[in-house]
Curated annotation (Swiss-Prot):
<keyword id="KW-0507">mRNA processing</keyword>
<comment type="function">
    <text>Involved in pre-mRNA splicing.</text>
</comment>
<keyword id="KW-0508">mRNA splicing</keyword>
<comment type="similarity">
    <text>Belongs to the CWC22 family.</text>
</comment>
<dbReference type="GO" id="GO:0000398">
    <property type="term" value="P:mRNA splicing, via spliceosome"/>
</dbReference>
<keyword id="KW-0539">Nucleus</keyword>
<protein>
    <recommendedName>
        <fullName>Pre-mRNA-splicing factor CWC22</fullName>
    </recommendedName>
</protein>
<dbReference type="InterPro" id="IPR016024">
    <property type="entry name" value="ARM-type_fold"/>
</dbReference>
<feature type="compositionally biased region" description="Basic and acidic residues">
    <location>
        <begin position="73"/>
        <end position="89"/>
    </location>
</feature>
<feature type="region of interest" description="Disordered">
    <location>
        <begin position="414"/>
        <end position="450"/>
    </location>
</feature>
<dbReference type="InterPro" id="IPR003890">
    <property type="entry name" value="MIF4G-like_typ-3"/>
</dbReference>
<feature type="region of interest" description="Disordered">
    <location>
        <begin position="670"/>
        <end position="831"/>
    </location>
</feature>
<dbReference type="GO" id="GO:0003723">
    <property type="term" value="F:RNA binding"/>
</dbReference>
<feature type="domain" description="MI">
    <location>
        <begin position="460"/>
        <end position="576"/>
    </location>
</feature>
<dbReference type="InterPro" id="IPR003891">
    <property type="entry name" value="Initiation_fac_eIF4g_MI"/>
</dbReference>
<feature type="region of interest" description="Disordered">
    <location>
        <begin position="1"/>
        <end position="89"/>
    </location>
</feature>
<dbReference type="InterPro" id="IPR050781">
    <property type="entry name" value="CWC22_splicing_factor"/>
</dbReference>
Amino acid sequence: MPRSLSRSVSPRPRSPSLSPPRPDSRSSRGRSLTPDDIPAYKRKRSPSPNPRDRPASPPTRRRRSQSPYRNSNRAEIDRPNVKDIDPNRRRARENALLEKQINMALADDGDADGTVATTKKSADEIARAEFAKLLGSRSGGAYIPPAKLRAMQAEAAKDKTSAEYQRISWDALKKSINGLINKVNISNIKHIVPELFGENLIRGRGLFARSVMRAQASSLPFTPVFAALVAIINTKLPQVGELVLIRLISQFRRAYKRNDKTVCHATSTFIAHLCNQYVAHEIVALQILLLCLDRPTDDSIEVAVGFMREVGQFLSENSPKANNTVFERFRAVLHEGQISKRCQYMIEVLFQVRKDKYKDNPAVPEGLDLVEEEEQITHRVTLDDELQVQESLNLFKADPNFVQNEERYNAIKREILGDSDDESGTESGSEYSESEDDEDEDVAPEKAGIQDMTETNLINLRRTIYLTIMNSLNFEEAVHKLMKVNIPEGREIELCNMVIECCSQERTYSNFYGLIGERFCKLHRIWTDAFQEAFQKYYDTIHRYETNKLRNIGRFFGHLLASDGISWAVLHVVHMNEEETTSSSRIFVKIVLQEMVEEMGINRVAERFRIPDLKPAFAGMFPMDNPKNARFSINYFTSIGMGKVTEDMREYLQNAPKLLAAQQAALAAAESSDSDTDSSSDISSSSDSDSDTDSDASSYSRRSRRRRYSSDSRSPPPQRRRYSSDSRSPSPPPRRRQYSDEPRSPSPPPRRRRYSDDSRSPSPPPRRRYSGDSRSPSPPPRRRYADDSRSPSPPPHRRRYSDDSRSPSPPPRRRRYSDNSRSPSPPPRRR
């Protein structure tokens, strides 16, 4: 019964998760299951857990019992327990702490038996061996963390004579040279050259040659830049330039034998520019041309044409006969017709380039002529020479005299760069410093002071601005493009001048230019100041422009003023008087003001002219210091239809006589005491009882110019007065008086003075008359001015009008002016 039960139960298949634990074979082998055992066995079974309730990851560490075979006498190190969420990071930290504890334990154990030194020594040897293995491999070996690599480099740098340190410096030199060559261009070549000289180019000349050749082959348009760089270095270190040239010639010969047209073209282009820089002799250029033209093929002709375009200008200047021979050979090849049509066309284009004198292919482009021809060292290397390319210079090789050679190059570097802070002359006996000339030290300062007196850059800038303006559809596009033009600092006025000049060239004024100027003025203060400066310049030189250009320029500035693009204070340069204006300047001001009135209206313009803050700037346009200038300005603005802006001047002109009379009276009263002594002799000889002294006027009349004045009175006394000029008479005729423009002796206060300008009735009440030409205070009594005649003349019966009279009816009788008269003047004649 029990056996059958066991057989029926045991073969029953169960899932692994539900199968009970199998009883120990040792305990069950001796006996079989009993009925009492079966319930006990079933009671031990428990339901299996749900797989979904299981944890996502197994426990990170199992607790195991201590191994029975562990030696209790051995020193035990407890593994550190680090709490961290990230298991990988926790494991790494635990390992690091464990390694540290082990090292500390080893150090403690070695204090007594001297094992510490052995441990440290073995660690240093291991690190050095690993670093040597790293340096010996071309690929750099396995990855080393940066911190560990820096530690290894610092360990190797302790001994500068070691191969490890030399390898580190070699790798740094290679990276530095490659980086500097890859970023050189026309604009920064002057900054790259000192940095290159800062590296040891004598030790790394192979690296430099390889790097510059690779960079040139990958970017042919930069060939002139690389050639200029080699030329500069060749002046100081000729062995570097010679090595570059030798490798180029060797590379050209190999490429020509292999029919590699691409390499031939790149190498020949580099050689051509080295010839242009006088690093290579022209004989190598001629050899290359003859080699390509000896047995012409399509590829050789293409290489020869490309080479000739680069070196043609140099050969035409230095070897004209050989240059003509080469072109004769080109012509013969063209006439033979054994090459393709494409190559024939290339030769024809080459002849056209020669006819144009290589204007698109200059020998030395602008900005790369950095070495004087006398300072350059030319290497005479030909295609037939046995060349030593020195490929071993590209590879690292330990130098037993590394420190001494570095010190020698540092001395050369100080001589080249002119570093005055370091000691100089300590290595003057070295083989490198003997090859340097003292005159070469001044190359960099001389080049820094070169000035382009031809103003080529300025012409190119103006051309760019002109083409940009002409190619724009509207003013917004023009401003947008002009803002992208690279205008040098301080040259902003050139853009303003070009906009104005383009505007002046139009047949009629176009508002397109005015809107451009307005937009620029409102973009930045720099452009506002530039256009204000341009206004003053064009106002001073406006007489040089013809009428049409003058009109366009005037309307342009009128638009800027009306739109507040520039300040109205720029009108301070305008002085509206007869002496300081010309016909061109008056027309210019008229056009400017008319444009302003057209856009703003006369009322707004008049209001702006009356702003108190701007009145000092308009003092020249609306003068109120001199009635003559005020009258001129009033007439000018009235004639151009802007009489409304002259109201202040008209008011001033009406009040001017009263103010002037008050000033003259005060001045005459203050100086009346000094006039008695000077007028005594003239009073006794004068027949007119109310005439003043003329002695002061006669003595100073030789120095001042006087004008004649006429009286408005028709009373029996003489009715006309004259202003004598250059009077030399000691005494005036009777009943006449001389008056000087600049009297130096005071005269007694006058009673009354008449102005002929305001008299319009036969017998008006006495009025005062003002002379526009008189600029010094003069008393206005009822006195008459005399001529320079030495005998009295009978008084005329009719009055005479002065020069400034504006009476509508002319006088019936006139009298001549007698200037510098030395004889008695005849009585006046009727006309």
